[in-house]
A protein has these predicted regions:
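Insoluble glucan recognition modules
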Residues: 1-203
Length: 203
C-alpha cells in the first residue's frame, strides 16, 4: 500500500443493532402484526444484538422474525442457521415441544433447540449451572419444577450459542407472572419454600 502526501480521511461507522426483535407466525399472532400474540423477544442482557425466547411450538407451523412490528425487514435466517427447517420462506420445527430461540444479529446466527430452563440457587439445589435436578420438565404445554430447598426463585434459559453468563438470559416469577431480566438491573425476587411447585406457562 502506497500513501502520498495528501491527507487521507477515513470514516468508520459503527453498526447500530435494533433494540427490539419480534417473532410472528401461525401460532404467534396468526401473521397479523396487530395481534397481541406476536412475541416480543427478550434481549440477552448487555449483549448487543442478541435476543431470545422460549415458547411451545407445533411441528410444521411457520414463524419468522423482524426488528420492526411490520413487514419489510422480516427474515427467516442469517449467515449461520441451525435447529430448524425453512418451508416457503418461514421457519419450522420437526416436532411439537418447547424450543429456545436465540438470535445473534452481531454474529449473524439464528439458533433453535429444545428448551432447557434451569432453576438456580438454594431452592433448586445450588448455584452450579446446568444441574439436571434443577431442569424444568414439560407437562403438556407448561414447564414444572419442584423446589428442593428454601430461597429466592431464579431461573435461566440455556443456549448452545451463548457467549455470556447464565443471568443474561434470566427470568423470575413475580406476582404470579414470568418477568424477564432483559437489559434491566438485577431483579426483585420472591422467596419460596421447599416442596412448592413452580409452573411456567410460556405461551
Amino acid at each position: 500500500v502506497v500513501f502520498n502526501s495528501k491527507t487521507l480521511a477515513v470514516t468508520i461507522s459503527a453498526v447500530a443493532f435494533p433494540e427490539s426483535l419480534y417473532m410472528i407466525g401461525d401460532e404467534f399472532g396468526g401473521w397479523d402484526w396487530k395481534s397481541d400474540g406476536v412475541v416480543e423477544m427478550t434481549p440477552v442482557s448487555k449483549q448487543e444484538g442478541q435476543f431470545w425466547n422460549v415458547r411451545y411450538f407445533s411441528a410444521k407451523k411457520g414463524f419468522k422474525y423482524s426488528p420492526i412490528r411490520d413487514w419489510g425487514k422480516d427474515f427467516h435466517g442469517l449467515k449461520t442457521n441451525d435447529g430448524y427447517a425453512v418451508d416457503g420462506g418461514n421457519c419450522t420445527v420437526e416436532a411439537d415441544g418447547f424450543y429456545m430461540v436465540h438470535v445473534d444479529l452481531k454474529r449473524e446466527m439464528v439458533h433453535v433447540e429444545p428448551a432447557r430452563i434451569y432453576g438456580m440457587g438454594d431452592c433448586f439445589g445450588g448455584w452450579d449451572a446446568g444441574m439436571e435436578a434443577a431442569l424444568f420438565k414439560a407437562d403438556g404445554k407448561v414447564l414444572k419444577a419442584t423446589l428442593v430447598g428454601d430461597g429466592e426463585i431464579r431461573m435461566y434459559a440455556e443456549s448452545s450459542i451463548a457467549n455470556s453468563d447464565w443471568w443474561t438470559r434470566e427470568c423470575i416469577v413475580l406476582d404470579g407472572k414470568i418477568v424477564y431480566r432483559g437489559n434491566g438491573d438485577d431483579q426483585k425476587r420472591v422467596n419460596c419454600t421447599k416442596g412448592q411447585e413452580v409452573t411456567l406457562d410460556l405461551n
